[in-house]
Design a protein with these regions (language model features):
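Solvent-exposed residues in well-ordered beta-strands and their adjoining turns
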Residues: 29-31, 77-78, 97-99, 131, ...
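Active-site-adjacent substrate-binding region
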Residues: 53-60, 129, 135-188
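Histidine/acidic-residue-rich, glycine-tolerant segments that coordinate divalent metal ions
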Residues: 1-76, 81-87, 170, 195
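Divalent metal-coordination and catalytic microenvironments
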Residues: 34, 48, 94, 147, ...
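His/Asp/Glu-rich mid-to-C-terminal helical/loop segments that flank catalytic regions of hydrolases
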Residues: 47, 57, 61, 109-113, ...
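A conserved active-site cap/scaffold subdomain adjacent to cofactor or substrate pockets
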Residues: 83-108
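Metal-dependent peptidase/peptidase-like ectodomains
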Residues: 11-32, 37, 41-44, 102-155
Length: 229
């Protein structure tokens, strides 16, 4: 159920529907020194800032976004304990989202290369580790085509919408890897609400209208009955 889709509507997509999610950590190591004498050390804070900017150019300048969307987000920066000490080490944590396995592999390689070379240019080092969390949530095209009439019976033709791919991720992707599957969205947003003003998932003000689950129940029942015919 989706907080930014109106009650009574169903959204689906054939093929890659939700992104693969990977977490990364970059450990930037420099040389600690006093903040008044930066030339005596190697500043991992400045190097980390340069790496963050460099990672964004992987998406904006090195990735063919007309094929598929991709995201690199640095969301955590840890380093330093005092205002007048340049620390020895800074850690960057973030997430990578991709809708294509080839693009995923290339972006992983470029993150490692970008971080290490930027660090090297300043005399620092950057060690990158990437943890693959979920796969691309892939809807089997043949199954999806077969099940669209089931959605129409549940919600009406005007309320069944072919959606764009989503850069959020789902562990349902592991089921879809094993058997032909379909993952879809049912509306949980009150009618008349502007989707841009509806609070997204994973935020403090997230809210859904549970009456939207009626459409979901109808859809699931139709899917089961129609699939077994």
């Amino acid at each position: 159920i989706n907080s930014q889709t109106e009650i009574g509507k169903i959204k689906y997509r054939s093929g890659g529907t939700m992104a693969a999610s990977d977490w990364f950590k970059i450990k930037v190591k420099g040389k600690q020194t006093h903040g008044s004498q930066p030339w005596e050390g190697i500043d991992p804070v400045v190097v980390s800032a340069q790496i963050i900017n460099g990672l964004q150019s992987i998406i904006s300048r090195q990735t063919e976004l007309t094929k598929n969307a991709a995201v690199i987000t640095v969301s955590v920066i840890n380093g330093g304990v005092r205002s007048n000490i340049i620390p020895e080490e800074v850690s960057l944590l973030g997430t990578i989202r991709t809708l294509d396995t080839g693009m995923q592999r290339t972006i992983h390689e470029k993150i490692k290369l970008t971080a290490s070379k930027i660090a090297e240019a300043s005399g620092a080092t950057a060690e990158t580790s990437i943890d693959k969390k979920t796969l691309v949530t892939y809807n089997n095209p043949e199954l999806t085509k077969k099940m669209i009439p089931s959605f129409v019976k549940a919600a009406g033709a005007d309320n069944v919408i072919e959606a764009e791919a989503v850069t959020g991720a789902e562990d349902f992707s592991f089921f879809a890897e094993k058997v032909p599957s379909i993952f879809f969205f049912i509306g949980g947003m009150e009618k008349g609400t502007d989707p841009k003003k509806a609070f997204p998932h994973h935020t403090p003000d997230f809210r859904i209208d549970e009456s939207g689950m009626k459409t979901g129940i109808k859809a699931f029942c139709n899917l089961v009955f129609d699939y077994t015919k």
